[in-house]
């Protein structure tokens, strides 16, 4: 089986293309919101607050999404969560255009978007396994890493262009539009039959998933590594708006390029990871990725030269893929199908909760 075999499945290909567009819209939003926050407040501490607002809902939404994903149709859950995100993006657009959007409203809507996005992310990660044959699951998740990183390259670049050419209001509208193709695909595709968990109590099901993830050392280590990398590595992306303006002295287009450098290098690394398949041990990739993460962060911290800063951001993108693809593939390979949604949600919850903690600490230190 070749590394691109999952693309022969029309369902996977359709979700890959439209999911990339929707994720690009989300990345554009994730840059536009902190940009607008910084424009309103001129404070890196508020950037940390916006990161907390966007990611803290994962504490509730991610495990609930995991439980629902194991109980119910993942396709239906994705349609609902995607529809909610469209409504919220249109609300941001309408309030921004009318001049009614202030920092309080923006943070409140960021929290609501965080709930919807966290639910969708945890459900989509486990949904991939239902649109390819079981033997293609590992290859599909490697390709899914390409989807994530293509969108991370396109989204910030689009945001930089839109913010420079127009404003955040336009970015909010484009985010809503970007979801339409994925919702259309989800409305018509079918999925393969999988084992579903028997509904008991929500808390009991969350506890059962947590117990499984903790007792299996492979799953436990994967979740912990992803969490720590998010706290000490990925959190720097939430501070990009402040770094671009105050350290590197660049405008909106420069901010887009700074964050896109992460996506571009991540994309190239993801292609290499897909082509290599299982020829490199996942443990080797993770350990190497952790070292490279430290190198990239050190470069960003040590310079005020924009091009060098882009290099540092790009290096963290290489490291992120090396760690994230290995961690995600490990989780999806070893988790039982009836627990896939819950264990995946714990992995994502760790990443999403650690990110704002790191961003908040970084923002406070930067202001100090």
Name the predicted role of every residue range.
Residues 2-57, 215-262:
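Helix-loop boundary and gating motifs at the non-cytosolic
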Residues 20, 101-119, 227, 308-322:
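Hydrophobic core of transmembrane alpha-helices in multi-pass small-molecule transporters
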Residues 34-40, 92-98, 154-174, 246-247, ...:
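Transmembrane alpha-helix termini and helix-breaking/packing motifs in multi-pass membrane transporters
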Residues 38, 91-95, 113, 185-186, ...:
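MFS-fold secondary transporters
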Residues 44-45, 134-144, 252-253, 337-346:
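Loop-to-transmembrane helix entry/capping segments in MFS-fold secondary transporters
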Residues 60, 64, 71, 77-81, ...:
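C-terminal transmembrane bundle of multi-pass solute transporters/carriers
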Residues 99, 126, 130, 168, ...:
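Helix-loop junctions on the cytosolic side of multi-pass membrane transporters
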Residues 109-150, 156:
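Cytoplasmic helix-loop-helix junction between adjacent transmembrane helices
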């Amino acid at each position: 089986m070749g590394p691109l075999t999952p693309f022969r499945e029309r369902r996977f290909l359709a979700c890959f293309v439209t999911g990339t567009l929707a994720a690009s819209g989300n990345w554009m939003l994730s840059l536009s919101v902190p940009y607008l926050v910084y424009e309103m407040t001129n404070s890196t501490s508020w950037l940390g607050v916006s990161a907390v607002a966007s990611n803290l809902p994962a504490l509730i939404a991610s495990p609930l999404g995991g439980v629902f994903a194991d109980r119910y149709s993942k396709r239906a859950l994705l349609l609902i969560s995607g529809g909610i995100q469209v409504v919220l993006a249109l609300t941001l657009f309408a309030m921004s255009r009318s001049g009614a959007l202030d920092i309080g409203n923006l943070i409140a809507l960021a929290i609501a978007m965080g709930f919807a996005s966290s639910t969708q992310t945890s459900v989509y990660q486990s949904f991939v396994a239902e649109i390819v044959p079981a033997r293609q699951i590992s290859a599909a998740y490697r390709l899914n890493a390409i989807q994530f990183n293509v969108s991370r390259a396109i989204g910030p670049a689009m945001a930089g262009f839109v913010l420079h050419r127009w404003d955040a209001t336009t970015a909010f509208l484009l985010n809503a539009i970007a979801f339409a193709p994925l919702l259309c695909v989800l409305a018509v595709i079918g999925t393969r039959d999988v084992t579903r968990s028997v509904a008991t109590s929500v808390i009991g099901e969350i506890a059962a998933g947590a117990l499984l993830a903790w007792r299996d050392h492979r799953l436990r280590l994967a979740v912990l590594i992803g969490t720590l990398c998010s706290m000490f590595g990925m959190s720097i992306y939430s501070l990009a708006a402040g770094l671009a303006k105050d350290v590197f002295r660049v405008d909106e287009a420069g901010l887009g390029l700074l964050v896109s450098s992460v996506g571009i290098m991540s994309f190239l690394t993801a292609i290499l990871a897909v082509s290599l398949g299982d020829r490199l041990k996942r443990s080797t990739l993770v350990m190497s990725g952790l070292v490279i993460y430290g190198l990239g962060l050190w470069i960003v911290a040590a310079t005020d030269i924009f091009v060098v800063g882009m290099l540092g951001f790009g290096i963290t993108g290489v490291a992120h893929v090396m760690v994230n693809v290995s961690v995600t593939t490990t989780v999806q390979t070893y988790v039982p199908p009836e627990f896939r949604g819950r264990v995946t949600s714990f992995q994502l919850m760790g990443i999403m909760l650690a990110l704002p903690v790191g961003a908040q600490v970084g923002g406070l230190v930067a202001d100090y």
